[in-house]
């Protein structure tokens, strides 16, 4: 018999797991990892910003995509991938970053999907589904940390220097600033580890004596708030 068990801690863990997965996915797909120095739409490198060529703007660069302003372009800003193939990503460090982040995000999305069904199923192969998911989240967090540590090592690539100036180098941004996607990825990584720790509390909440009493009474829907 399937028992639907809902507790504050289990629902909070499910919600946080989904938020962690989506925050990492959105950050990975975004072009706002780096915000370049101000320049005119058709100007070259000039730390002075605006020129007679047009109003100054700041292009953005992601792991595999970018946003630039194109003169006479109807939409003003053109966003899309600069790398058609994996080998065209700005540097080997960013290629490694993409691999580790993708692996971590894949695990987080799998856990987020599974977490939705933890109200009905609390074990898998005689193992607590919360503990298994918590372990997967911890592994995903390690992948994310490795990816985020490798990411700044690619700041010395030629592609980054086009956006950040010639002074940019590994772990030095030059004229760029970190965009919201980078900070979102950092926050998602921290949240990932919090979810891994909190999964133990979700397991305790769904296997408490109060829950067992409700099951013995024959209830199929158990809601403990």
From Swiss-Prot:
The chain crosses the membrane at residues 11-31, 99-119, 129-149, 178-198. One of its GO terms (biological process) is positive regulation of fertilization. It comes from the Eukaryota. InterPro entries: LHFPL. It is found in: Membrane. One of its GO terms (cellular component) is membrane. It is a multi-pass membrane protein. Keywords: Fertilization, Membrane, Transmembrane, Transmembrane helix. Belongs to the LHFP family. Plays a role in fertility. Involved in distal reproductive tract development. This is LHFPL tetraspan subfamily member 2a protein.
């Amino acid at each position: 018999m399937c028992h639907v068990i809902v507790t504050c801690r289990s629902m909070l863990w499910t919600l946080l797991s989904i938020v962690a997965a989506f925050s990492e996915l959105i950050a990975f797909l975004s072009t706002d990892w780096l915000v370049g120095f101000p320049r005119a739409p058709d100007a070259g490198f000039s730390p002075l910003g605006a020129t007679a060529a047009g109003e100054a703007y700041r292009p953005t660069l992601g792991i595999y995509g970018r946003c630039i302003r194109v003169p006479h372009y109807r939409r003003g800003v053109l966003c899309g991938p600069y790398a058609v193939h994996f080998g065209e990503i700005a540097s080997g460090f960013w290629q490694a970053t993409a691999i580790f982040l993708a692996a971590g995000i894949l695990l987080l999305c799998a856990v987020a999907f599974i977490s939705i069904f933890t109200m009905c199923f609390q074990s898998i192969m005689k193992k607590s589904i919360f503990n298994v998911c918590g372990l997967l989240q911890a592994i995903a967090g390690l992948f994310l940390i490795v990816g985020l540590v490798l990411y700044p090592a690619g700041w010395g690539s030629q592609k980054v220097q086009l956006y950040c100036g010639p002074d940019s180098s590994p772990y030095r941004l030059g004229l760029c600033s970190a965009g919201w996607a980078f900070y979102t990825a950092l926050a998602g990584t921290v949240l990932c580890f919090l979810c891994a720790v909190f999964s133990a509390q979700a397991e305790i909440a769904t296997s408490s004596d109060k829950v067992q009493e409700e099951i013995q009474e024959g209830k199929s829907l158990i809601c403990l708030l």
